[in-house]
């Protein structure tokens, strides 16, 4: 019979009611993961869980369940004597061992009339007879046999799981996720420590950017077996507009991060979360210096968890690649209207108070209008997002007005030939001045804002596009700070 062996990690050191509850949570998550494979039958023993079903599918799904140390697809038999084990091993492995160096690893649990070494010797003998050569130090093939009671499990594959604690064993956290590289990793790391993680995404772009971000979040939540996580989508446009009107540009980075914290706290309280989580890494960008972090969290009455605080970018990227979000995150367009070209790394208390006052109404509006989508509804929600299919183009049509949405200094250093400059708040005035019957093509540092502006103008009946190629055409020295 085919089975998947599930090994648990930290859970084994727990005792009593705590362990029983964690086992319940892990089994609940495992059952949800198994639904992707048509379901499974589970059996539990001390230190092991066995899943019977579509083994090839289950080994992949169950290796993404938090609390699982590793899994192995295996063949299980009921034996009566040691020769039964050797015969099964010969049947399974004789066909692949010829001419290969191999090792037999045996693990036993319980009382038996033989030792692990005796089993290894018996199995090794039949595999040598099949043309293999024993090499315990540097084998080409490793054959594993696990013996528990009168059952023997045969396997060759050990697939690493995420480890950690079962999801839901450590309370609820609201993660501020931009869908860039860092913040999904931070959310994943807290999920790994047993937290139920809901996600807050602050949308500053149009439908295309939102869809892309939700695909990243969906990839993250593919790990959240056992919890139908909430995705809170907040239209943060009001905050960006209020900030540009009422906050000095050098403080935009700090102001926007602080607004995110304020929005997060209010939504977290409504959801019953007891902490916020962010993807900040100390010193990575100007808004993540100690001085800046002290300014943005001053007066915030909720714990702020920063799992990445001591990691460098290379470490974070490796984690993102491991959990499967990196490729999508790296392609996410950035909104470039809320980052200062010369950001301040600190703020005085009175400046922070002024920021709170300037953004209070906008923050309230964002919180009250936020949408909540459950993980299981996310696919349908994404499918329902229908941006114009032709909004991104590679070159401007003849006679089109090309509009540079970057700051004035960057425009002076470099811009596309014939382009005019306009800030995001000036776009409508520019269109009214030049005529709504013209075609407008926008570009920005990396595309997020230009997509958003083009889509917004199309809703007003104006022919507008975002220029795709400028994402790589804008000189790196002109590009704004990338958020988390």
Swiss-Prot record:
It catalyses: [ThiI sulfur-carrier protein]-S-sulfanyl-L-cysteine + a uridine in tRNA + 2 reduced [2Fe-2S]-[ferredoxin] + ATP + H(+) = [ThiI sulfur-carrier protein]-L-cysteine + a 4-thiouridine in tRNA + 2 oxidized [2Fe-2S]-[ferredoxin] + AMP + diphosphate; [ThiS sulfur-carrier protein]-C-terminal Gly-Gly-AMP + S-sulfanyl-L-cysteinyl-[cysteine desulfurase] + AH2 = [ThiS sulfur-carrier protein]-C-terminal-Gly-aminoethanethioate + L-cysteinyl-[cysteine desulfurase] + A + AMP + 2 H(+). Transmembrane segments: none annotated. One of its GO terms (cellular component) is cytosol. Residues 56-158 form the THUMP domain. InterPro entries: Rhodanese-like_dom, Rhodanese-like_dom_sf, Rossmann-like_a/b/a_fold, ThiI_AANH, ThiI_fer, ThiI_N, THUMP_dom, THUMP_ThiI. Gene3D superfamilies: 3.30.2130.30, HUPs, Rhodanese-like domain. It comes from the Archaea. The active site is at 444 (cysteine persulfide intermediate). Residues 396-479 form the Rhodanese domain. It holds the Pfam family ThiI_fer. Its EC number is 2.8.1.4. ATP binds at residues 176-177, 257, 279, 288. HAMAP family: ThiI (MF_00021). PANTHER family: TRNA SULFURTRANSFERASE. This is tRNA sulfurtransferase. It comes from Pyrobaculum aerophilum (strain ATCC 51768 / DSM 7523 / JCM 9630 / CIP 104966 / NBRC 100827 / IM2). The lineage of its organism: Archaea, Thermoproteota, Thermoprotei, Thermoproteales, Thermoproteaceae.
């Amino acid at each position: 019979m085919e089975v998947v062996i599930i090994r648990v990690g930290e859970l084994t050191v727990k005792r009593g009611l705590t362990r029983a509850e964690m086992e319940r949570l892990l089994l609940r998550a495992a059952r949800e993961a198994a639904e992707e494979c048509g379901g499974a039958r589970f059996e539990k023993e001390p230190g092991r869980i066995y899943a019977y079903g579509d083994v090839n599918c289950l080994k992949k799904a169950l290796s993404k369940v938090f609390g699982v140390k590793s899994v192995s697809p295996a063949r299980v038999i009921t034996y009566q004597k040691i020769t039964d084990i050797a015969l099964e091993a010969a049947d399974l492995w004789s066909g692949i061992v010829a001419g290969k160096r191999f090792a037999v690893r045996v693990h036993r649990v319980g009382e038996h009339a033989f030792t692990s070494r005796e089993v290894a010797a018996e199995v090794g003998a039949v595999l040598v007879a099949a043309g293999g050569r024993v090499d315990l130090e540097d084998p080409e093939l490793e054959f594993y046999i696990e013996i528990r009671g009168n059952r023997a499990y045969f396997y060759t594959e050990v697939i690493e799981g995420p480890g950690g604690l079962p999801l839901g064993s450590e309370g609820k956290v609201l993660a501020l996720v931009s869908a860039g590289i860092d913040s999904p990793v931070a959310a994943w790391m807290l999920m790994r420590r047993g937290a139920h993680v809901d996600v807050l995404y602050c949308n500053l772009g149009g439908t295309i950017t939102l869809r892309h971000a939700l695909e990243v979040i969906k990839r993250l939540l593919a790990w959240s077996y056992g919890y139908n996580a909430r995705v809170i989508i907040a239209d943060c446009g009001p905050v960006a507009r209020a900030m540009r009107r009422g906050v000095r540009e050098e403080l935009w980075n700090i102001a926007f991060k602080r607004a995110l914290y304020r929005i997060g706290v209010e939504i977290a309280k409504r959801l019953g979360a007891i902490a916020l989580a962010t993807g900040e890494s100390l010193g990575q960008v100007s808004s993540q210096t100690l001085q800046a972090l002290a300014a943005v969290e001053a007066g915030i009455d909720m714990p702020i968890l920063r799992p990445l605080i001591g990691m460098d970018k290379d470490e974070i990227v490796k984690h993102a690649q491991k959990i499967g979000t990196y490729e999508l995150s790296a392609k996410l367009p950035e909104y470039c209207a809320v980052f200062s070209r010369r950001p301040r790394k600190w703020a005085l208390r009175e400046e922070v108070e002024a920021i709170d006052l300037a953004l209070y109404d906008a923050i309230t509006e964002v919180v009250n209008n936020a949408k909540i989508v459950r993980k299981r509804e996310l696919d349908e929600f994404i499918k329902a997002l229908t941006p114009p299919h032709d909004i991104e183009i590679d070159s401007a049509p003849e006679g089109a007005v090309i509009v540079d949405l970057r700051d004035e200094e960057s425009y002076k250093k470099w811009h596309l030939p014939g382009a005019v400059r306009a800030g995001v708040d000036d776009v409508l005035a520019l269109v009214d001045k030049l005529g709504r019957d013209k075609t407008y093509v926008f570009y920005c540092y990396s595309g997020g804002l230009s997509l958003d502006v083009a889509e917004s103008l199309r809703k007003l009946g104006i022919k507008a596009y975002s220029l795709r190629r400028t994402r790589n055409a804008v000189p790196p020295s002109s590009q704004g700070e990338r958020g988390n």
